[in-house]
Amino acid sequence: MKQSMVFSPTLREVPADAEIKSHQLLLRAGFMRQNASGIYSFLPFGLKVLHKVERIVREEMERAGAVELLMPAMQAAELWQESGRWYSYGSELMRMKDRNAREFALGATHEEVITDLVRDEVKSYKKLPLTLYQIQTKFRDEQRPRFGLLRGREFLMKDAYSFHATQESLDEVYDRLYKAYSNIFARCGLNFRAVIADSGAMGGKDTHEFMVLSDVGEDTIAYSDTSDYAANIEMAPVVATYTKSDEAEKALEKVATPDQKAIEEVSAFLNIAADKCIKSMVFKVDEKLVVVLVRGDHEVNDVKVKNVYGASVVELASHEEVKALLNCEVGSLGPINVTGDIEIIADHAVASIVNGCSGANEEGFHYVNVNPERDFKVSQYTDLRFIQEGDQSPDGNGTILFARGIEVGHVFKLGTRYSEAMNATFLDENGKTQPLIMGCYGIGVSRTVAAIAEQFNDENGLVWPKAVAPFHVHVIPVNMKSDAQREMGENIYNSLQEQGYEVLLDDRAERAGVKFADADLFGLPVRVTVGKKADEGIVEVKVRATGESEEVNVEELQTYIANILK
Protein backbone atom coordinates (compact mmCIF):
# COMPACT_ATOMS: atom_id res chain seq x y z
CA MET A 1 0.00 0.00 0.00
CA LYS A 2 1.27 3.46 -0.87
CA GLN A 3 1.15 5.95 1.96
CA SER A 4 0.13 8.85 -0.29
CA MET A 5 -3.15 7.03 -0.98
CA VAL A 6 -3.96 6.10 2.62
CA PHE A 7 -6.22 7.97 5.03
CA SER A 8 -3.94 8.09 8.07
CA PRO A 9 -4.17 11.51 9.75
CA THR A 10 -1.52 11.74 12.46
CA LEU A 11 -1.36 14.09 15.45
CA ARG A 12 1.81 15.61 16.87
CA GLU A 13 0.25 16.56 20.21
CA VAL A 14 -1.29 14.22 22.76
CA PRO A 15 -5.10 14.68 22.89
CA ALA A 16 -6.09 16.28 26.18
CA ASP A 17 -8.70 13.67 27.12
CA ALA A 18 -6.48 10.65 26.36
CA GLU A 19 -5.22 9.39 29.73
CA ILE A 20 -3.30 6.23 28.85
CA LYS A 21 -0.66 5.29 26.28
CA SER A 22 -2.83 3.08 24.06
CA HIS A 23 -5.53 5.75 23.78
CA GLN A 24 -2.98 8.48 23.07
CA LEU A 25 -1.02 6.53 20.48
CA LEU A 26 -3.96 5.01 18.60
CA LEU A 27 -5.30 8.56 18.17
CA ARG A 28 -1.93 10.14 17.36
CA ALA A 29 -1.04 7.44 14.82
CA GLY A 30 -4.37 7.85 13.05
CA PHE A 31 -5.60 4.34 13.85
CA MET A 32 -8.92 5.62 15.20
CA ARG A 33 -10.96 8.75 15.86
CA GLN A 34 -13.62 9.51 18.46
CA ASN A 35 -17.20 10.05 17.32
CA ALA A 36 -18.69 10.55 20.78
CA SER A 37 -17.77 9.59 24.32
CA GLY A 38 -16.90 5.88 24.23
CA ILE A 39 -17.62 5.57 20.48
CA TYR A 40 -14.84 5.33 17.88
CA SER A 41 -14.25 4.95 14.16
CA PHE A 42 -11.48 2.57 13.13
CA LEU A 43 -9.40 4.21 10.40
CA PRO A 44 -7.62 2.07 7.76
CA PHE A 45 -4.50 1.14 9.75
CA GLY A 46 -6.52 0.47 12.90
CA LEU A 47 -8.98 -1.63 10.94
CA LYS A 48 -6.14 -3.75 9.57
CA VAL A 49 -4.99 -4.50 13.13
CA LEU A 50 -8.57 -5.27 14.17
CA HIS A 51 -9.00 -7.65 11.23
CA LYS A 52 -5.77 -9.46 12.11
CA VAL A 53 -6.94 -10.03 15.67
CA GLU A 54 -10.28 -11.25 14.28
CA ARG A 55 -8.47 -13.67 11.98
CA ILE A 56 -6.50 -15.15 14.88
CA VAL A 57 -9.72 -15.49 16.88
CA ARG A 58 -11.52 -17.23 14.01
CA GLU A 59 -8.66 -19.64 13.37
CA GLU A 60 -8.46 -20.74 17.00
CA MET A 61 -12.22 -20.92 17.48
CA GLU A 62 -12.66 -23.09 14.42
CA ARG A 63 -9.71 -25.26 15.48
CA ALA A 64 -11.59 -25.78 18.76
CA GLY A 65 -14.71 -26.94 16.91
CA ALA A 66 -16.82 -23.76 17.06
CA VAL A 67 -18.98 -22.66 14.11
CA GLU A 68 -19.54 -19.00 13.22
CA LEU A 69 -22.93 -17.35 12.79
CA LEU A 70 -24.28 -13.81 13.15
CA MET A 71 -27.12 -12.75 15.43
CA PRO A 72 -29.05 -9.46 15.49
CA ALA A 73 -27.76 -6.50 17.48
CA MET A 74 -31.34 -5.44 18.25
CA GLN A 75 -33.06 -7.87 20.60
CA ALA A 76 -36.69 -8.16 21.66
CA ALA A 77 -37.31 -7.26 25.30
CA GLU A 78 -39.48 -10.37 25.69
CA LEU A 79 -36.41 -12.61 25.59
CA TRP A 80 -34.65 -10.62 28.31
CA GLN A 81 -37.84 -10.61 30.35
CA GLU A 82 -38.05 -14.37 29.96
CA SER A 83 -34.55 -14.83 31.38
CA GLY A 84 -35.20 -12.26 34.11
CA ARG A 85 -32.30 -10.04 33.10
CA TRP A 86 -34.45 -7.23 31.69
CA TYR A 87 -35.00 -6.21 35.29
CA SER A 88 -31.65 -7.19 36.84
CA TYR A 89 -29.02 -6.31 34.22
CA GLY A 90 -28.96 -2.65 35.18
CA SER A 91 -28.62 0.70 33.45
CA GLU A 92 -25.80 -0.44 31.14
CA LEU A 93 -28.37 -2.18 28.93
CA MET A 94 -29.41 0.20 26.16
CA ARG A 95 -33.19 0.01 25.83
CA MET A 96 -35.52 1.52 23.24
CA LYS A 97 -39.02 1.40 21.83
CA ASP A 98 -40.11 1.18 18.21
CA ARG A 99 -42.95 3.21 16.69
CA ASN A 100 -45.42 0.66 18.04
CA ALA A 101 -44.07 1.04 21.60
CA ARG A 102 -42.56 -2.44 21.53
CA GLU A 103 -39.44 -2.61 23.69
CA PHE A 104 -36.01 -3.68 22.46
CA ALA A 105 -32.43 -3.74 23.70
CA LEU A 106 -29.21 -3.18 21.83
CA GLY A 107 -27.17 -6.31 22.44
CA ALA A 108 -24.82 -6.06 25.39
CA THR A 109 -24.53 -9.84 25.19
CA HIS A 110 -26.46 -12.60 23.41
CA GLU A 111 -27.32 -15.40 25.86
CA GLU A 112 -31.05 -14.86 25.42
CA VAL A 113 -30.94 -14.72 21.61
CA ILE A 114 -28.77 -17.82 21.22
CA THR A 115 -30.83 -19.78 23.76
CA ASP A 116 -34.02 -18.88 21.90
CA LEU A 117 -32.45 -19.91 18.60
CA VAL A 118 -31.14 -23.26 19.81
CA ARG A 119 -34.24 -24.25 21.80
CA ASP A 120 -36.29 -24.03 18.61
CA GLU A 121 -33.86 -26.15 16.58
CA VAL A 122 -32.10 -28.62 18.90
CA LYS A 123 -34.47 -31.16 20.42
CA SER A 124 -32.32 -34.27 20.83
CA TYR A 125 -29.09 -35.25 22.56
CA LYS A 126 -27.96 -36.52 19.15
CA LYS A 127 -27.38 -32.91 18.04
CA LEU A 128 -25.20 -32.15 21.06
CA PRO A 129 -22.65 -30.83 21.86
CA LEU A 130 -22.94 -27.69 19.76
CA THR A 131 -20.67 -24.62 19.90
CA LEU A 132 -21.59 -21.44 18.02
CA TYR A 133 -19.83 -18.08 17.96
CA GLN A 134 -20.07 -14.65 16.39
CA ILE A 135 -17.94 -11.52 16.09
CA GLN A 136 -20.23 -8.55 16.40
CA THR A 137 -20.63 -5.05 17.78
CA LYS A 138 -21.91 -4.83 21.34
CA PHE A 139 -23.45 -1.85 23.13
CA ARG A 140 -23.29 -0.88 26.80
CA ASP A 141 -24.31 2.44 28.28
CA GLU A 142 -21.18 2.91 30.38
CA GLN A 143 -21.63 5.56 33.04
CA ARG A 144 -18.10 6.81 32.49
CA PRO A 145 -16.47 5.71 29.24
CA ARG A 146 -12.70 6.08 29.54
CA PHE A 147 -9.33 4.82 28.37
CA GLY A 148 -10.32 4.77 24.71
CA LEU A 149 -11.14 1.26 23.51
CA LEU A 150 -10.73 -0.24 26.98
CA ARG A 151 -14.06 1.03 28.27
CA GLY A 152 -16.37 2.12 25.48
CA ARG A 153 -20.07 2.20 24.81
CA GLU A 154 -19.72 0.41 21.49
CA PHE A 155 -17.14 -2.32 20.94
CA LEU A 156 -16.39 -5.42 18.90
CA MET A 157 -16.70 -8.72 20.73
CA LYS A 158 -16.40 -12.39 19.97
CA ASP A 159 -19.00 -14.30 21.94
CA ALA A 160 -19.39 -18.07 21.81
CA TYR A 161 -22.01 -20.34 23.35
CA SER A 162 -21.86 -24.09 23.84
CA PHE A 163 -24.76 -26.48 24.47
CA HIS A 164 -24.45 -29.90 26.10
CA ALA A 165 -26.32 -32.95 27.30
CA THR A 166 -23.96 -33.61 30.21
CA GLN A 167 -21.71 -31.73 32.61
CA GLU A 168 -18.77 -33.82 31.42
CA SER A 169 -19.35 -32.58 27.87
CA LEU A 170 -19.38 -28.96 29.09
CA ASP A 171 -16.17 -29.52 31.04
CA GLU A 172 -14.46 -30.91 27.94
CA VAL A 173 -15.48 -28.02 25.67
CA TYR A 174 -14.70 -25.46 28.40
CA ASP A 175 -11.16 -26.83 28.66
CA ARG A 176 -10.82 -26.80 24.86
CA LEU A 177 -11.92 -23.16 24.60
CA TYR A 178 -9.78 -22.19 27.59
CA LYS A 179 -6.83 -23.54 25.59
CA ALA A 180 -8.04 -21.73 22.45
CA TYR A 181 -8.14 -18.44 24.37
CA SER A 182 -4.62 -19.02 25.66
CA ASN A 183 -3.50 -19.61 22.07
CA ILE A 184 -5.25 -16.45 20.83
CA PHE A 185 -3.62 -14.13 23.33
CA ALA A 186 -0.23 -15.82 22.98
CA ARG A 187 -0.39 -15.40 19.19
CA CYS A 188 -1.20 -11.71 19.71
CA GLY A 189 2.07 -11.47 21.64
CA LEU A 190 0.42 -10.54 24.93
CA ASN A 191 1.74 -11.07 28.45
CA PHE A 192 -1.39 -12.38 30.16
CA ARG A 193 -2.69 -14.55 33.00
CA ALA A 194 -5.82 -16.68 33.19
CA VAL A 195 -7.39 -16.07 36.62
CA ILE A 196 -10.28 -17.42 38.66
CA ALA A 197 -13.14 -14.93 38.37
CA ASP A 198 -16.67 -13.96 39.37
CA SER A 199 -19.50 -14.56 36.90
CA GLY A 200 -21.28 -11.28 37.72
CA ALA A 201 -24.48 -10.55 35.80
CA MET A 202 -23.83 -13.51 33.48
CA GLY A 203 -24.71 -16.08 36.11
CA GLY A 204 -23.33 -19.59 36.34
CA LYS A 205 -20.14 -20.73 38.05
CA ASP A 206 -16.62 -21.98 37.32
CA THR A 207 -15.36 -18.99 35.39
CA HIS A 208 -11.98 -17.61 34.35
CA GLU A 209 -10.87 -14.21 33.11
CA PHE A 210 -7.94 -13.66 30.78
CA MET A 211 -6.02 -10.66 32.04
CA VAL A 212 -3.37 -8.71 30.14
CA LEU A 213 -0.85 -7.46 32.69
CA SER A 214 -0.76 -3.66 32.69
CA ASP A 215 -0.46 -0.91 35.26
CA VAL A 216 -3.54 0.79 33.76
CA GLY A 217 -5.74 -2.29 34.22
CA GLU A 218 -8.93 -1.73 36.19
CA ASP A 219 -8.78 -5.18 37.80
CA THR A 220 -6.42 -6.44 40.48
CA ILE A 221 -4.95 -9.93 40.13
CA ALA A 222 -3.90 -11.84 43.24
CA TYR A 223 -1.21 -14.38 42.39
CA SER A 224 1.18 -16.66 44.22
CA ASP A 225 4.87 -15.88 44.21
CA THR A 226 5.77 -19.59 43.92
CA SER A 227 2.87 -21.38 42.15
CA ASP A 228 0.53 -20.94 39.18
CA TYR A 229 -2.34 -19.72 41.38
CA ALA A 230 -3.98 -16.52 40.10
CA ALA A 231 -7.42 -15.05 40.72
CA ASN A 232 -9.28 -11.81 40.38
CA ILE A 233 -8.97 -10.19 43.80
CA GLU A 234 -12.76 -10.41 44.13
CA MET A 235 -12.61 -14.21 44.03
CA ALA A 236 -9.45 -15.04 45.97
CA PRO A 237 -10.42 -16.82 49.21
CA VAL A 238 -8.59 -15.96 52.41
CA VAL A 239 -7.13 -19.02 54.14
CA ALA A 240 -5.48 -17.20 57.05
CA THR A 241 -5.96 -18.49 60.58
CA TYR A 242 -6.52 -16.07 63.45
CA THR A 243 -5.46 -16.71 67.02
CA LYS A 244 -7.36 -15.04 69.85
CA SER A 245 -5.04 -13.50 72.42
CA ASP A 246 -5.21 -14.57 76.08
CA GLU A 247 -5.70 -10.94 77.14
CA ALA A 248 -8.37 -10.64 79.85
CA GLU A 249 -11.63 -9.11 78.67
CA LYS A 250 -12.28 -5.62 80.06
CA ALA A 251 -15.52 -3.85 80.81
CA LEU A 252 -17.27 -2.30 77.81
CA GLU A 253 -16.95 1.49 77.79
CA LYS A 254 -18.46 4.22 75.63
CA VAL A 255 -16.06 7.08 74.86
CA ALA A 256 -16.40 10.38 73.03
CA THR A 257 -14.72 10.56 69.62
CA PRO A 258 -15.66 14.00 68.26
CA ASP A 259 -15.26 14.31 64.48
CA GLN A 260 -13.50 10.92 64.28
CA LYS A 261 -15.19 8.71 61.69
CA ALA A 262 -12.72 6.84 59.49
CA ILE A 263 -10.95 3.82 61.01
CA GLU A 264 -7.58 5.57 60.66
CA GLU A 265 -8.88 8.60 62.58
CA VAL A 266 -10.50 6.56 65.35
CA SER A 267 -7.46 4.28 65.66
CA ALA A 268 -5.10 7.25 66.08
CA PHE A 269 -7.47 9.14 68.41
CA LEU A 270 -8.00 6.17 70.76
CA ASN A 271 -4.45 4.82 70.35
CA ILE A 272 -5.86 1.44 69.37
CA ALA A 273 -4.36 -0.52 66.47
CA ALA A 274 -6.55 -0.77 63.37
CA ASP A 275 -6.52 -4.57 63.59
CA LYS A 276 -8.33 -4.27 66.94
CA CYS A 277 -11.06 -2.07 65.48
CA ILE A 278 -14.29 -3.44 64.01
CA LYS A 279 -15.39 -1.88 60.74
CA SER A 280 -19.19 -1.99 60.34
CA MET A 281 -21.00 -1.52 57.03
CA VAL A 282 -24.59 -1.96 55.91
CA PHE A 283 -25.21 -3.68 52.57
CA LYS A 284 -28.41 -4.00 50.60
CA VAL A 285 -28.51 -7.65 49.56
CA ASP A 286 -31.24 -7.77 46.92
CA GLU A 287 -33.87 -6.01 49.07
CA LYS A 288 -32.57 -7.09 52.50
CA LEU A 289 -30.35 -4.87 54.68
CA VAL A 290 -27.47 -6.70 56.39
CA VAL A 291 -24.74 -5.48 58.77
CA VAL A 292 -21.30 -6.73 57.66
CA LEU A 293 -18.26 -6.65 59.96
CA VAL A 294 -14.56 -6.87 59.11
CA ARG A 295 -11.41 -6.01 60.99
CA GLY A 296 -10.32 -2.38 60.74
CA ASP A 297 -7.28 -3.15 58.60
CA HIS A 298 -9.36 -5.20 56.14
CA GLU A 299 -11.83 -4.29 53.37
CA VAL A 300 -15.25 -5.85 52.75
CA ASN A 301 -15.44 -7.86 49.53
CA ASP A 302 -18.99 -7.32 48.26
CA VAL A 303 -18.71 -10.27 45.85
CA LYS A 304 -18.19 -12.56 48.84
CA VAL A 305 -21.20 -10.97 50.54
CA LYS A 306 -23.22 -11.65 47.39
CA ASN A 307 -22.08 -15.27 47.33
CA VAL A 308 -23.00 -15.83 50.98
CA TYR A 309 -26.62 -15.07 50.13
CA GLY A 310 -26.67 -16.23 46.50
CA ALA A 311 -27.92 -12.72 45.73
CA SER A 312 -28.36 -11.08 42.34
CA VAL A 313 -27.48 -7.55 43.47
CA VAL A 314 -25.37 -6.34 46.40
CA GLU A 315 -24.65 -2.67 47.03
CA LEU A 316 -23.85 -0.37 49.92
CA ALA A 317 -26.94 0.89 51.67
CA SER A 318 -27.64 4.59 51.23
CA HIS A 319 -27.23 7.08 54.06
CA GLU A 320 -31.01 7.28 54.27
CA GLU A 321 -31.37 3.50 54.54
CA VAL A 322 -28.70 3.32 57.26
CA LYS A 323 -30.39 6.13 59.18
CA ALA A 324 -33.76 4.40 58.99
CA LEU A 325 -32.29 1.04 60.04
CA LEU A 326 -29.98 2.04 62.91
CA ASN A 327 -30.85 5.69 63.57
CA CYS A 328 -27.26 6.84 63.12
CA GLU A 329 -24.83 8.16 60.55
CA VAL A 330 -22.55 5.90 58.52
CA GLY A 331 -19.41 7.06 60.37
CA SER A 332 -20.83 5.91 63.72
CA LEU A 333 -21.93 2.38 62.76
CA GLY A 334 -21.34 -0.50 65.14
CA PRO A 335 -22.78 -3.94 66.01
CA ILE A 336 -23.67 -3.29 69.66
CA ASN A 337 -27.36 -2.84 70.56
CA VAL A 338 -28.47 -3.77 67.04
CA THR A 339 -31.97 -5.23 67.31
CA GLY A 340 -32.38 -8.98 66.91
CA ASP A 341 -34.24 -8.84 63.60
CA ILE A 342 -31.22 -7.25 61.86
CA GLU A 343 -28.78 -9.87 60.64
CA ILE A 344 -25.07 -9.42 61.41
CA ILE A 345 -22.43 -11.40 59.52
CA ALA A 346 -18.71 -11.09 60.17
CA ASP A 347 -15.39 -12.03 58.68
CA HIS A 348 -13.45 -14.77 60.49
CA ALA A 349 -10.87 -12.26 61.69
CA VAL A 350 -13.45 -10.39 63.78
CA ALA A 351 -13.94 -13.39 66.08
CA SER A 352 -10.32 -13.12 67.29
CA ILE A 353 -10.60 -9.48 68.43
CA VAL A 354 -10.19 -8.95 72.18
CA ASN A 355 -10.93 -5.57 73.78
CA GLY A 356 -11.38 -3.89 70.44
CA CYS A 357 -13.34 -0.82 69.43
CA SER A 358 -16.40 -0.16 67.29
CA GLY A 359 -18.88 2.54 66.45
CA ALA A 360 -21.59 3.17 69.05
CA ASN A 361 -24.43 3.93 66.60
CA GLU A 362 -24.36 7.41 68.08
CA GLU A 363 -22.75 10.44 66.47
CA GLY A 364 -19.39 11.31 68.09
CA PHE A 365 -19.08 8.14 70.21
CA HIS A 366 -17.36 4.76 70.00
CA TYR A 367 -17.16 1.72 72.25
CA VAL A 368 -13.84 0.40 73.54
CA ASN A 369 -13.14 -2.99 75.12
CA VAL A 370 -15.51 -4.56 72.63
CA ASN A 371 -15.60 -8.36 72.60
CA PRO A 372 -17.57 -10.32 69.99
CA GLU A 373 -20.26 -12.67 71.31
CA ARG A 374 -20.12 -11.05 74.75
CA ASP A 375 -21.19 -7.62 73.49
CA PHE A 376 -22.99 -8.57 70.28
CA LYS A 377 -24.08 -11.70 68.45
CA VAL A 378 -23.05 -12.70 64.94
CA SER A 379 -25.32 -14.82 62.73
CA GLN A 380 -22.44 -16.23 60.70
CA TYR A 381 -18.66 -16.00 60.56
CA THR A 382 -17.30 -16.52 57.05
CA ASP A 383 -14.73 -15.22 54.57
CA LEU A 384 -15.86 -11.67 53.74
CA ARG A 385 -12.69 -9.68 53.16
CA PHE A 386 -10.41 -8.96 50.23
CA ILE A 387 -7.20 -10.92 50.23
CA GLN A 388 -4.09 -8.80 50.86
CA GLU A 389 -0.51 -8.89 49.64
CA GLY A 390 1.51 -11.07 51.98
CA ASP A 391 -1.43 -13.37 52.79
CA GLN A 392 -0.94 -17.08 52.27
CA SER A 393 -1.80 -18.23 48.74
CA PRO A 394 -5.15 -20.07 48.72
CA ASP A 395 -3.49 -23.12 47.13
CA GLY A 396 -1.12 -23.35 50.10
CA ASN A 397 1.96 -22.53 48.03
CA GLY A 398 3.72 -19.23 48.62
CA THR A 399 2.36 -15.82 49.45
CA ILE A 400 0.11 -13.44 47.53
CA LEU A 401 1.33 -10.59 45.35
CA PHE A 402 -0.80 -8.15 43.34
CA ALA A 403 -0.70 -7.05 39.71
CA ARG A 404 -3.04 -4.92 37.62
CA GLY A 405 -4.78 -6.44 34.62
CA ILE A 406 -6.95 -5.57 31.61
CA GLU A 407 -9.69 -8.15 31.09
CA VAL A 408 -9.69 -9.24 27.45
CA GLY A 409 -11.49 -12.57 27.72
CA HIS A 410 -13.91 -14.40 29.99
CA VAL A 411 -15.15 -18.00 29.95
CA PHE A 412 -18.15 -19.22 31.96
CA LYS A 413 -19.85 -22.48 32.80
CA LEU A 414 -23.42 -21.22 32.77
CA GLY A 415 -25.01 -24.57 33.54
CA THR A 416 -28.79 -24.39 33.21
CA ARG A 417 -29.14 -20.73 34.29
CA TYR A 418 -30.67 -19.65 30.95
CA SER A 419 -32.09 -22.91 29.66
CA GLU A 420 -34.26 -23.41 32.74
CA ALA A 421 -35.45 -19.80 32.73
CA MET A 422 -36.28 -19.98 29.01
CA ASN A 423 -37.46 -23.61 28.89
CA ALA A 424 -34.72 -24.67 26.46
CA THR A 425 -34.83 -28.46 26.67
CA PHE A 426 -33.87 -31.61 24.78
CA LEU A 427 -34.71 -35.31 24.94
CA ASP A 428 -31.92 -37.40 26.44
CA GLU A 429 -31.07 -40.95 25.37
CA ASN A 430 -33.78 -42.27 27.69
CA GLY A 431 -36.42 -40.05 26.12
CA LYS A 432 -36.61 -37.75 29.16
CA THR A 433 -36.81 -33.97 28.88
CA GLN A 434 -33.72 -32.21 30.24
CA PRO A 435 -32.58 -28.57 30.29
CA LEU A 436 -29.67 -27.76 27.98
CA ILE A 437 -26.37 -27.29 29.81
CA MET A 438 -24.57 -24.18 28.57
CA GLY A 439 -21.18 -22.51 28.44
CA CYS A 440 -20.36 -18.94 27.39
CA TYR A 441 -17.06 -17.57 26.12
CA GLY A 442 -16.29 -13.91 25.33
CA ILE A 443 -13.33 -11.98 23.92
CA GLY A 444 -13.20 -8.20 23.62
CA VAL A 445 -11.73 -7.99 20.12
CA SER A 446 -11.40 -4.20 19.96
CA ARG A 447 -10.27 -4.16 23.59
CA THR A 448 -7.55 -6.66 22.68
CA VAL A 449 -6.25 -4.17 20.09
CA ALA A 450 -5.98 -1.55 22.85
CA ALA A 451 -4.35 -4.04 25.23
CA ILE A 452 -1.70 -4.87 22.61
CA ALA A 453 -1.05 -1.15 22.08
CA GLU A 454 -0.80 -0.70 25.85
CA GLN A 455 1.84 -3.41 26.21
CA PHE A 456 3.75 -2.67 22.99
CA ASN A 457 4.89 0.95 22.79
CA ASP A 458 7.80 3.21 23.61
CA GLU A 459 8.46 6.94 23.85
CA ASN A 460 8.27 7.27 20.05
CA GLY A 461 5.09 5.38 19.29
CA LEU A 462 3.53 1.97 18.81
CA VAL A 463 5.58 -1.23 18.47
CA TRP A 464 3.26 -3.82 16.92
CA PRO A 465 4.02 -7.56 17.17
CA LYS A 466 4.38 -9.13 13.74
CA ALA A 467 1.15 -11.15 13.99
CA VAL A 468 -1.10 -8.09 14.31
CA ALA A 469 0.92 -5.28 12.71
CA PRO A 470 -1.00 -3.50 9.93
CA PHE A 471 2.05 -4.07 7.67
CA HIS A 472 5.22 -6.09 8.07
CA VAL A 473 7.64 -3.68 6.41
CA HIS A 474 7.77 0.10 6.04
CA VAL A 475 9.81 1.17 2.99
CA ILE A 476 10.93 4.81 3.12
CA PRO A 477 12.69 6.51 0.20
CA VAL A 478 14.15 9.56 1.95
CA ASN A 479 14.07 11.85 -1.10
CA MET A 480 11.31 11.17 -3.62
CA LYS A 481 12.95 13.66 -6.01
CA SER A 482 15.90 11.29 -6.36
CA ASP A 483 15.27 8.89 -9.24
CA ALA A 484 17.58 6.29 -7.69
CA GLN A 485 15.85 6.37 -4.30
CA ARG A 486 12.36 6.47 -5.74
CA GLU A 487 12.97 3.59 -8.16
CA MET A 488 14.75 1.44 -5.59
CA GLY A 489 11.94 2.04 -3.11
CA GLU A 490 9.37 0.97 -5.71
CA ASN A 491 11.39 -2.13 -6.60
CA ILE A 492 11.77 -3.18 -2.94
CA TYR A 493 8.08 -2.53 -2.37
CA ASN A 494 7.05 -4.72 -5.31
CA SER A 495 9.50 -7.55 -4.64
CA LEU A 496 8.61 -7.84 -0.95
CA GLN A 497 4.91 -7.93 -1.81
CA GLU A 498 5.60 -10.71 -4.29
CA GLN A 499 7.22 -12.64 -1.44
CA GLY A 500 3.98 -12.38 0.55
CA TYR A 501 4.88 -9.52 2.87
CA GLU A 502 2.48 -6.69 3.61
CA VAL A 503 4.38 -3.53 2.75
CA LEU A 504 3.75 0.18 3.27
CA LEU A 505 5.65 2.48 0.89
CA ASP A 506 6.09 6.07 2.06
CA ASP A 507 5.94 7.78 -1.32
CA ARG A 508 5.05 11.18 0.12
CA ALA A 509 7.04 14.28 -0.73
CA GLU A 510 7.76 14.96 2.96
CA ARG A 511 10.92 15.80 4.85
CA ALA A 512 12.92 12.83 6.16
CA GLY A 513 12.22 13.83 9.78
CA VAL A 514 8.47 13.73 9.21
CA LYS A 515 8.69 10.33 7.54
CA PHE A 516 10.81 8.82 10.32
CA ALA A 517 8.58 10.28 13.05
CA ASP A 518 5.49 8.80 11.39
CA ALA A 519 7.26 5.46 10.94
CA ASP A 520 8.07 5.29 14.66
CA LEU A 521 4.51 6.31 15.49
CA PHE A 522 2.99 3.60 13.26
CA GLY A 523 5.28 0.97 14.80
CA LEU A 524 5.67 -1.50 11.92
CA PRO A 525 8.11 -4.34 12.71
CA VAL A 526 10.75 -3.52 10.05
CA ARG A 527 11.76 -0.23 8.44
CA VAL A 528 13.78 -0.14 5.20
CA THR A 529 15.29 3.29 4.52
CA VAL A 530 16.42 4.05 0.99
CA GLY A 531 18.85 6.95 1.23
CA LYS A 532 22.01 8.37 -0.28
CA LYS A 533 23.61 4.94 -0.75
CA ALA A 534 20.88 3.85 -3.15
CA ASP A 535 23.35 4.27 -6.02
CA GLU A 536 25.58 1.70 -4.30
CA GLY A 537 22.68 -0.73 -3.78
CA ILE A 538 22.75 -0.21 0.01
CA VAL A 539 19.73 0.35 2.29
CA GLU A 540 19.34 0.66 6.05
CA VAL A 541 17.17 -1.91 7.85
CA LYS A 542 15.88 -1.03 11.32
CA VAL A 543 14.00 -3.33 13.71
CA ARG A 544 11.32 -1.27 15.46
CA ALA A 545 11.16 -3.36 18.64
CA THR A 546 14.89 -3.22 19.42
CA GLY A 547 16.05 -0.13 17.56
CA GLU A 548 18.86 -2.14 15.98
CA SER A 549 19.80 -1.05 12.47
CA GLU A 550 22.20 -2.31 9.83
CA GLU A 551 23.18 -1.46 6.30
CA VAL A 552 22.24 -4.25 3.90
CA ASN A 553 22.93 -4.85 0.23
CA VAL A 554 19.62 -4.75 -1.62
CA GLU A 555 20.35 -8.14 -3.19
CA GLU A 556 20.43 -9.68 0.31
CA LEU A 557 17.43 -7.74 1.61
CA GLN A 558 14.76 -10.42 1.24
CA THR A 559 16.85 -13.00 3.12
CA TYR A 560 17.71 -10.45 5.82
CA ILE A 561 14.05 -9.50 6.35
CA ALA A 562 12.97 -13.14 6.30
CA ASN A 563 15.32 -13.83 9.21
CA ILE A 564 13.89 -10.92 11.19
CA LEU A 565 10.25 -11.84 10.58
CA LYS A 566 10.52 -15.63 10.82
From Swiss-Prot:
Keywords: Aminoacyl-tRNA synthetase, ATP-binding, Cytoplasm, Ligase, Nucleotide-binding, Protein biosynthesis
InterPro entries associated with the record: aa-tRNA-synt_IIb, aa-tRNA-synth_II, aa-tRNA-synth_II/BPL/LPL, Anticodon-bd, Anticodon-bd_dom_sf, Pro-tRNA-ligase_IIa, Pro-tRNA-synth_IIa_bac-type, Pro-tRNA-Synthase_IIa_type1
Region forming the signal peptide: none
Any GO CC annotation of this UniProt entry: cytosol
Catalytic EC class: ligase
Pfam families according to UniProt: HGTP_anticodon, tRNA-synt_2b, tRNA_edit
UniProt-listed Enzyme Commission number(s): 6.1.1.15
Keyword presence, Phosphoprotein: no
GO molecular function, one term: proline-tRNA ligase activity
Chief location: cytoplasm
Subcellular location: Cytoplasm
GO biological-process terms attached to the record: prolyl-tRNA aminoacylation
Catalysed reactions, as listed in the record: tRNA(Pro) + L-proline + ATP = L-prolyl-tRNA(Pro) + AMP + diphosphate
Keyword ATP-binding among UniProt keywords: yes
HAMAP family registered for this protein in UniProt: Pro_tRNA_synth_type1 (MF_01569)
PANTHER family in UniProt: MITOCHONDRIAL RIBOSOME PROTEIN L39/PROLYL-TRNA LIGASE FAMILY MEMBER, PROLINE--TRNA LIGASE
Role, per record: Catalyzes the attachment of proline to tRNA(Pro) in a two-step reaction: proline is first activated by ATP to form Pro-AMP and then transferred to the acceptor end of tRNA(Pro). As ProRS can inadvertently accommodate and process non-cognate amino acids such as alanine and cysteine, to avoid such errors it has two additional distinct editing activities against alanine. One activity is designated as 'pretransfer' editing and involves the tRNA(Pro)-independent hydrolysis of activated Ala-AMP.
Oligomer status and interactors: Homodimer.
Matching NCBIfam families: PRK09194.1, proS_fam_II
Family: Belongs to the class-II aminoacyl-tRNA synthetase family. ProS type 1 subfamily.
Record remark on domains: Consists of three domains: the N-terminal catalytic domain, the editing domain and the C-terminal anticodon-binding domain.
Name of the featured protein: Proline--tRNA ligase
Species assigned in the record: Bacillus cereus (strain B4264)
